[in-house]
Amino acid sequence: MTLPASKKSAPLGKIILIVLVLVAAAAGGMGYFSQKSNLDEAQTQTAALSQQTVEKVPAPLDPSDALFTAQPGELVFGKPDAAGTIIEYSSMSCPHCAFFHSDMLPQLKKDLLDTGKAKLVFRYFPLNEPALRATQLVECAPAEKRAQFIKVLFELQKNWAFSERFKDELKTIAAQGGLDAAQVDSCFADKQLEDRIIEGRQVAATRAGVNSTPSFFVNGVKLEDFSKADHFAKALESAPKKPAQPTGDAE
């Protein structure tokens, strides 16, 4: 009787090589997912806030409410005693916010801020942990450099906002502004500062109904369409007039 021919087995060396490749790939994948998991976990720190924001939309505030005036220590673009007040709620990781600052703010500055028709009060509304840490970085910068930090962070947003190594990228940017790694680490670890930023976001969400960025209020009235710079001027003409209140830190 003739036995059927057996299939030729793969060489042992080849099998070992395949196993090693699979192990290496698995290890690399585990490392990737571990990093991604860490980032996801960090970003959930603000997820609860987002849920709180959309669960209840408050009734519109009176335009004269103190929330729509510049507060001491806030960053103000333009002349602090300008008659009109534009409030901007912004997230440092928000691409639309970056676009506003690069493409629309210069025109707004020329038409309204430099002429004294209005001032722009910049407020933080971080949407995720990278934005929160970038906000802390701005607040830890010297007062006279905060506007420049915001400008650079928006210009370099693609470098850090969507990176798993966003803290390292932020440290690189901070170094250009004179903050060393130890100062940045201390800034990120400042729980009081973090709580103050998150509290400001909660106030905007629960009292003014802010649920996206950027959001703008012109003399206390929400500007729904800010797709063009001249919409701000038109809103100023129709919005309630408010007495000038020279507060905040002028840029």
Enumerate the predicted regions with their spans.
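C-terminal cap of thioredoxin/glutaredoxin-like
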Residues: 2-57, 65, 91, 173-251
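A short beta-strand-turn-helix
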Residues: 65-84, 249-250
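A generic local structural motif
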Residues: 71-75, 105-107, 201-204
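Extracellular/periplasmic catalytic domains that process cell-envelope and extracellular macromolecules
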Residues: 80, 113-115, 130, 208-211
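Residue-level signature of catalytic and energy-coupling elements of molecular machines
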Residues: 86, 94, 184
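Structural alpha/beta surface segment adjacent to cysteine/selenocysteine redox centers
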Residues: 90-93, 98-175
